[in-house]
């Protein structure tokens, strides 16, 4: 049985990967966490994962945690405020982890990355959280792994359900504005307005799972991890068609109209729009936004989990699917 070890296993991405892999009996799933007694870690343990504790900045601990692993999925949170408070960076953390994994003899690395905005824009803009990940990805490709696959997540559908995130964009679909509308206020994405959306809960883990089923096929191939693409306006209109509620999209004339208050996460979000507009909406830096690759990978994972997923659909989660599941009965 091949061991796949996940760093960041209790986060949105890592837990999705763990859940998907645990449904394939060909893999043993090991999850690295800072606190093995946390509720999220204990839930993964109850589902069959092996839980190990390690400090991501301690390469020797990380090497031990990855020992014996055939594959690794690594995600770090570049917008984690604790990094700044500890005078550390996401780049430092990522480098420590991948070096520990390489030293442990991991063969196949799937790394949650992002487009290198500073490089792809010729220095015209920077998205520090993505740029740091892209730098770590570049280093990983020279560390002796047999394969390295960068996977680039799209915009999580699930963030619309978080009140704090909804408030950043005007309140949609959580809190009405002073005029009684559920308003989504954001800059345009650019180009054909193909905003790459992802259901991290439903699809991301399966997409990563699909890579591990044939890692040589996906070596050095940046993966667009998306579930659907459409404009913010169409997303809001889909919500209206399902719920009948008053909702609207209001386009900002420029990303610079977004208030960030110096917060790293908000600065990154504004940077996404600046970068995407510079690239005419081709956010991933690998060509037009597409979901054929993600579809093929999810279908491969579904086949590998056949005993556990009889009767389930292998399709990606469309915007309508996502909104129907959360709001479809509110009309």
From Swiss-Prot:
GO terms for molecular function: oxidoreductase activity. Signal peptide: none annotated. GO terms for cellular component: nucleus. It comes from the Eukaryota. Its EC number is 1.-.-.-. The keyword NADP applies. The keyword NADP applies. Keywords: NADP, Oxidoreductase. NADP(+) binds at residues 8-13, 34-38, 55-56, 76-78, 133, 155-167. Pathway: Secondary metabolite biosynthesis. Belongs to the NmrA-type oxidoreductase family. NmrA-like family domain-containing oxidoreductase; part of the him gene cluster that mediates the biosynthesis of himeic acid A, a ubiquitin-activating enzyme (E1) inhibitor. First, himA, together with the trans-enoyl reductase himH, catalyzes the formation of apolyketide chain, which is then condensed with leucine by the NRPS activity of himA. Dieckmann cyclization and release from himA gives a tetramic acid intermediate as the product of himA PKS-NRPS. HimG then catalyzes alpha-oxidation of the tetramic acid ring, with a subsequent rearrangement to yield apyrone intermediate. This is NmrA-like family domain-containing oxidoreductase himF. It comes from Aspergillus japonicus.
């Amino acid at each position: 049985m091949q061991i796949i070890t996940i760093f960041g296993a209790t986060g949105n991405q890592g837990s999705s990967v763990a859940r998907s892999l645990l449904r394939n009996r060909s893999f043993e799933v090991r999850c690295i966490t800072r606190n093995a007694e946390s509720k999220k870690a204990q839930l993964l343990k109850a589902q069959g994962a092996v839980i190990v504790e390690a400090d991501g900045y301690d390469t020797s601990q990380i090497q031990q945690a990855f020992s014996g692993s055939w594959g690794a999925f690594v995600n770090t949170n570049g917008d984690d405020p604790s990094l700044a408070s500890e005078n550390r960076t996401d780049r430092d953390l990522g480098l420590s982890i991948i070096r520990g994994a390489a030293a442990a003899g991991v063969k196949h690395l799937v790394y949650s990355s992002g487009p290198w905005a500073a490089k792809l824009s010729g220095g015209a803009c920077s998205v520090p959280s993505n740029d740091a990940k892209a730098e770590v990805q570049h280093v990983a490709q020279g560390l002796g792994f047999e394969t390295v696959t960068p996977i680039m997540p799209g915009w999580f559908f699930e963030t619309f359900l978080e009140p704090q995130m909804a408030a950043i964009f005007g309140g949609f679909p959580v809190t009405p504005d002073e005029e009684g509308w559920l308003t989504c206020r954001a800059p345009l994405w650019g180009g054909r307005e193909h905003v790459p959306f992802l259901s991290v809960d439903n699809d991301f883990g399966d997409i990563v799972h699909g890579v591990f089923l044939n890692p040589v096929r996906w070596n050095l191939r940046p993966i667009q991890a998306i579930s659907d693409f459409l404009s913010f306006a169409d997303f809001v209109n889909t919500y209206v068609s399902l719920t009948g509620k008053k909702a609207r999209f209001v386009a900002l004339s420029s990303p610079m109209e977004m208030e960030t208050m110096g917060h790293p996460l908000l600065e990154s979000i504004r940077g996404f729009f600046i970068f995407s507009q510079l690239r005419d909406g081709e956010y991933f830096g690998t060509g037009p936004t597409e979901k054929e690759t993600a579809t093929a990978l999810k279908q491969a994972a579904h086949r590998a989990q056949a005993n556990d997923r009889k009767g389930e659909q292998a399709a990606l989660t469309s915007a309508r699917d996502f909104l129907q599941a959360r709001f479809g009965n509110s009309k």
